[in-house]
């Protein structure tokens, strides 16, 4: 069974040069909590930056970003502390309800993700979904005001939730209007952090991965925002079917990393190059003819190319698990309120 913690949430980012922003809230209930994992956790993110947190140990909603603490009054935190204490009890009851219907005992998890995205062209998206033991359980479709059930238990929940038209419309309005309004507000609070630009360091590596098979890697790291476009070109033409892609993932220092690779016959005379675009900055690196790396460092003042003979450079790859959650047979009576929690 997979245990997913919102505090460790990793977001995959679309491989694109179009800048987007998102607001997400995760809730997690655990049936058998311990000293490391609380019974209930709620965490909020703008993009990949934690902004709020609450858990069943502290029983307080608290800011995780200084620009949240500076801009929201104490009564905001107290109001949503009270709401989350209610959600804590609701999630605990709902998880027990699910365990009974699945005939489960022991350690199990119940998760919820709600949020929205603001795209560069001004368009928006919204999402609300739930999971049990890390697997999709039920997903809200705001356009049809309906729920997509993933199994027989979720289908019972679907029938109950779809009977409450007021709640369906409320969720749609929250996703399309209130969530976006709060996202724009938070983006203004954290402008210096969220609107900054750090261009990537890009490296190409040639390595024999199997006898008779050579792999070219193109790696980018140290960039923000996370939207980036990377492609391999062969003899001047883009290739896609032969390419393996890594996710765009946090590096742990407020920047991101990603990679892509392509296999080839080492006897081939084809010329491969990696093309990278990030926030209007374009970089092109040819694949090395011999084992080693070609490193390009992109800075605000210009681009410097360094040739470095390095072998076997590793990269930490994070794999994203879905962050979802919730289920119940009667729609919850704990209202989200005018602000996300």
UniProtKB/Swiss-Prot annotation:
Where in this protein does the record put region Alpha-3? 198-289
Region (Alpha-1), start-end ranges = 19-105
Q: According to the UniProt record, what happens if one changes residue 110 to I?
A: Impair expression of folded protein
State what changing residue 40 to Y does.
Impair expression of folded protein
Binding residues for 8-(9H-purin-6-yl)-2-oxa-8-azabicyclo[3.3.1]nona-3,6-diene-4,6-dicarbaldehyde: 25, 27, 61, 76, 112
Q: Where is this region: Antigen-binding cleft?
A: 19-197
**Membrane-topology annotation of the record:** Single-pass type I membrane protein
Residues where pyridoxal binds: 61
Cytoplasmic compartment spans: 318-341
The record's section on SUPFAM superfamilies has: Immunoglobulin (SSF48726), MHC antigen-recognition domain (SSF54452)
Q: Where is this region: Connecting peptide?
A: 290-296
What does its PTM field state?
A: N-glycosylated.
Q: Which UniProt keywords apply?
A: Cell membrane, Disulfide bond, Endoplasmic reticulum, Endosome, Glycoprotein, Golgi apparatus, Immunity, Immunoglobulin domain, Innate immunity, Membrane, MHC I, Signal, Transmembrane, Transmembrane helix
| Subunit description | Heterotrimer that consists of MR1, B2M and metabolite antigen. Major classes of metabolite ligands presented by MR1 include riboflavin-related antigens, pyrimidines and ribityl lumazines, nucleobase adducts and folate derivatives. Forms reversible covalent Schiff base complexes with microbial pyrimidine-based metabolite, which serves as a molecular switch triggering complete folding, stable association with B2M and translocation of the ternary complex from endoplasmic reticulum to the plasma membrane. Alternatively, forms non-Schiff base complexes with ribityl lumazines.
**How does the entry describe the domains?**
The alpha-1 domain is a structural part of antigen-binding cleft. The alpha-2 domain is a structural part of antigen-binding cleft.
User: What biological function has been recorded for the protein in this entry?
Assistant: Antigen-presenting molecule specialized in displaying microbial pyrimidine-based metabolites to alpha-beta T cell receptors (TCR) on innate-type mucosal-associated invariant T (MAIT) cells. In complex with B2M preferentially presents riboflavin-derived metabolites to semi-invariant TRAV1 TCRs on MAIT cells, guiding immune surveillance of the microbial metabolome at mucosal epithelial barriers.
**Name of the protein described by the UniProt record:** Major histocompatibility complex class I-related protein 1
């Amino acid at each position: 069974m997979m245990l997913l913690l919102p505090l460790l949430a990793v977001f995959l980012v679309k491989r694109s040069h179009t800048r987007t922003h998102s607001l997400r809230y995760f809730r997690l209930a655990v049936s058998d909590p311990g000293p490391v994992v609380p019974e209930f956790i709620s965490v909020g993110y703008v993009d990949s930056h934690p902004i709020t947190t609450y858990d069943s140990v502290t029983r307080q909603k608290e800011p995780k970003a200084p620009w949240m603490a500076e801009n929201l009054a104490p009564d905001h935190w107290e109001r949503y502390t009270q709401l989350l204490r209610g959600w804590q009890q609701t999630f605990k009851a709902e998880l027990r309800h699910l365990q009974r219907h699945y005939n489960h005992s022991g350690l199990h998890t119940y998760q919820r993700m709600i949020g929205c995205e603001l795209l560069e062209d001004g368009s928006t998206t919204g999402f609300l979904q739930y999971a049990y033991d890390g697997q999709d359980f039920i997903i809200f479709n705001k356009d049809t005001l309906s729920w997509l059930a993933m199994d027989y238990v979720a289908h019972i929940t679907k029938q109950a939730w779809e009977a409450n038209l007021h709640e369906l419309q409320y969720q749609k309005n929250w996703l399309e209007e209130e969530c976006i309004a709060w996202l724009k507000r938070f983006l203004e609070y954290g402008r210096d952090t969220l609107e900054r630009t750090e261009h990537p360091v890009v490296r190409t590596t040639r390595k024999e991965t199997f006898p008779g098979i050579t792999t070219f890697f193109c790696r980018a790291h140290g960039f923000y925002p996370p939207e980036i476009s990377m492609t391999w070109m062969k003899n001047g033409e883009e290739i896609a079917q032969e390419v393996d892609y890594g996710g765009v993932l946090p590096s742990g220092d407020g920047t991101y990393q990603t990679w892509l690779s392509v296999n080839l016959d080492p006897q081939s005379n084809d010329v491969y190059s990696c093309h990278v675009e990030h926030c209007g900055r374009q970089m092109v690196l040819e694949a090395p003819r011999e084992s080693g790396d070609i490193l390009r460092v992109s800075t605000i003042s210009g681009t410097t190319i360094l040739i470095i003979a390095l072998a076997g450079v590793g990269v930490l790859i994070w794999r994203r698990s879905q962050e979802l959650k919730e289920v119940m047979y009667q729609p919850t009576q704990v209202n989200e309120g005018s602000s996300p929690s």
